[in-house]
């Protein structure tokens, strides 16, 4: 298990087709060491942000999984709880990172963190002693405008936060 309880990672998603077709220009630069991001603005200059790790727009889904997904699953199999939390504004790349780009469900190379974690969990089941029994619980929630929605049960919306 890592000696750090929480890691903060950012992923700069690639421009989508609409952004590219409209002549959009990247405003974020990733520092070579992979821990800093520079955000340039036309009117206010440049801002610098530091993270445990930064994945740029050319990063591979596999690399993101290897850094954040695999260690969490390994820790879970050692008895710890694990959470991977995606946060960001609308269209910032949460779904791209967690699930994969639109239309990529059948393309293993483009699978996001969630399908890779699920595959890895079942791989770990296969490696375990046959007498060990596993129980898996998962939840997928969206918090938007301070409303919580269960993404696995569309009838459960505006859930209380405890």
Language-model-detected regions and their locations in the chain:
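Microtubule-binding structural modules
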Residues: 1-162
